[in-house]
Amino acid sequence: MTQSDHRHTRPSSYGGTVLTQRVSQATVEDSRPLRGWQRRAMVKYLASQPRDFLAVATPGSGKTTFALRVMTELLNSHAVEQVTVVVPTEHLKVQWTRAAATHGLALDPKFSNTNPRTSPEYHGVTMTYAQVAAHPTLHRVRTEGRRTLVIFDEIHHGGNAKAWGDAIREAFSDATRRLALTGTPFRSDDKPIPFVTYALDADGLMHSQADHTYSYAEGLADGVVRPVVFLVYSGQARWRNSAGEEHAARLGEPLSAEQTARAWRTALDPSGEWMPAVISAADQRLRQLRTHVPDAGGMIIASDQTAARAYANLLAQMTSETPTLVLSDDPGSSARITEFAKNTSQWLIAVRMVSEGVDIPRLSVGIYATSASTPLFFAQAIGRFVRSRHPGETASIFVPSVPNLLQLASELETQRNHVLGKPHRESTDNPLGGNPATMTQTEQDDTEKYFTAIGADAELDQIIFDGSSFGTATPAGSEEEAYYLGIPGLLDADQMRALLHRRQNEQLQKRTAAQQASSTPDRTSGAPASVHGQLRELRRELNSLVSIAHHHTGKPHGWIHNELRRRCGGPPIAAATHDQLKARIDAVRQLNAEPS
């Protein structure tokens, strides 16, 4: 080694020895110890020195920090000379640049196809997937010119269209190193994700293969991410069809796809009663959290710009504070996201700019007021709320009682991979006529052309936590609803589960006592119970039996619910039918009768 190299050897903090060259003055962020999963992934990466590496880690767990440490190691060892970071949105270009600066790394967020020159003081550049697709040859030439590390943030976007996938392969096939990151390593279609390895399973299907995986369940156990409590709201929805006929259906009951679509759309109507009631409940929950976490923030994810503006007006009227409104075609949106992340204001409203990758750790309360229902969109949206800052923090998400969403909420901890050629793949066709995750923000779908929303009342139907359902239905604005909205903001998962069980039991005891003390007979006695009431009682009975099984076997509640699903089939408890719940009740009774 010559003196002109300006390099020296040092022991690697992950094991072994590497050549180093100071990137810049070390910073506070760069000096922090890595989390366990990041350290294990670094050891694996440095030991194998792979050309391609796919890191799958739950949203909020620190994928960016891991990638920046890899970047630092490769630049210091001169394995690469420059870096290209590819991201889904313009805002993430700026976010990556700021994160890199805390590690002593300089990235150029202004790099463009029309002006591809950049200062030699930068270690690399940031660009969007769309930018690459617009001129892949330009990026191929740039990549071939110097030893390049390419980092793909949310790599599943590489399969958004055949043209995108082809462009990414053309631009970066000759890269020295490629590091792919995602929190959701799956898609709702069969488009292969570039530079991701697929392997055959026993059924002959191709599954994506990660080099390192860190699941949401692992993150919960390590305290890296927050537990999520879903507050599920149902209600009687009423609408009028094109012939002038009025119809009604209840969210949360078994409905046809068309009925579900119209009831869902009616509930989300800003001029109805359902959204104001849910916004009021969510704001009450946020105020409760802010007594313990003063800067806790809330976000409404809207279907389109029109609804977003209407929700903003509602919030301003109800809270006397103007919320931050983020629309993708507004040039000031990125600055508003950054400002909201730094300040202590209460509410943010967005269509989809904040649904993926955006880092706002103080977000603690969400309203899922969009008709997007694919697993990918849902997981990315919920991922905005799970980043943990302090022990005991929880996230509270308000969702409509729609079967697809209930199943996704109940299976939040399920680890998914991208499967090619999957039979009976979940449809990407939204029953409301268009997926807001892909349609333009001002586009109206066909559903709105042949039906008119009349209104919908709101009712807290159930609480979903750790795959289990808690509570019994109660009207919005009731004392029982306030009982759940007032749950303390700092509880670990075990404390939250115990509190939900206790509050559910107290709720049932109060109702029973009130009925016994009243001289007026129960209005439902002597009449067949509604489907809604039957499902509620069956869920309550099943949860009680699962609690008994928990004490009998020592197994976690979630494990018992999964075992019942394995034995009996069907969706999670929140979305199960009458017969499926009855079958599980019979099965858990058998489980309780078995020797411990």
Swiss-Prot record:
Positions of the UniProt region annotated as Disordered: 420-444, 506-533
Sequence ranges assigned to domain Helicase C-terminal in this UniProt record: 285-432
InterPro entries: Helicase/UvrB_N, Helicase_ATP-bd, Helicase_Restrict-Modif_Enz, P-loop_NTPase
Classification via Pfam families: ResIII
Gene Ontology MF terms in the entry: ATP binding; DNA binding; hydrolase activity
Annotated SMART domains: DEXDc
CDD domains from the UniProt entry: SF2_C (cd18785)
UniProt-listed SUPFAM superfamilies: P-loop containing nucleoside triphosphate hydrolases
Polar residues composition bias: residue spans: 510-523
Domain Helicase ATP-binding: start-end pairs: 44-203
Assigned protein family: To M.tuberculosis Rv2917.
Protein name: Uncharacterized protein ML1624
